[in-house]
Amino acid sequence: MKTLLLTLVVMTIVCLDLGYTLICFISSHDSVTCAPGENVCFLKSWCDAWCGSRGKKLSFGCAATCPKVNPGIDIECCSTDNCNPHPKLRP
């Protein structure tokens, strides 16, 4: 009886698929585990009034789908852990 119960518990765990959660950067050095359903990491960059002297503004994060591209905004999306690093920190 114990063997049957143990087998059922193991099969339940295997069949439930405990789920994979993606990890994405949210800043230059910090990352976060994305919420369920958020399956892509993104890096959004754009110029503001100080772009010439300070460089582009950056926004990092998780999303369910790749954010919409608008004029003047560059977006990179990916789907592996920590795949959206700061451009200066890329290998």
UniProtKB/Swiss-Prot annotation:
UniProt KW keywords: Acetylcholine receptor inhibiting toxin, Disulfide bond, Ion channel impairing toxin, Neurotoxin, Postsynaptic neurotoxin, Secreted, Signal, Toxin
Name by which UniProt lists this protein: Alpha-elapitoxin-Oh2b
Gene Ontology MF, one: toxin activity
Function: Binds with high affinity to muscular (alpha-1/CHRNA1) and neuronal (alpha-7/CHRNA7) nicotinic acetylcholine receptor (nAChR) and inhibits acetylcholine from binding to the receptor, thereby impairing neuromuscular and neuronal transmission. Recombinant LNTX1 leads to a functional block of the muscle-type acetylcholine receptors. Has a cytotoxic activity. This neurotoxin is lethal.
Comment field (misc): OH-6A and OH-6B are disulfide isomers which arise from cis-trans isomerization of the Cys-47-Cys-51 disulfide bond. They differ in the retention time in reversed-phase column and the conformation.
Protein family according to the UniProt entry: Belongs to the three-finger toxin family. Long-chain subfamily. Type II alpha-neurotoxin sub-subfamily.
Location(s), subcellular: Secreted
Subunit comment: Monomer.
Signal peptide, first to last residue: 1-21
InterPro entries to which the protein is assigned, alphabetical: Snake_3FTx, Snake_toxin-like_sf, Snake_toxin_con_site, Toxin_cobra-type
PROSITE patterns: SNAKE_TOXIN
Top-level lineage group: Eukaryota
Keyword Signal among record annotations: yes
Listed GO CC annotations: extracellular region
Tissue: Expressed by the venom gland.
Keyword Signal listed: yes
Chain ranges passing through the membrane: none
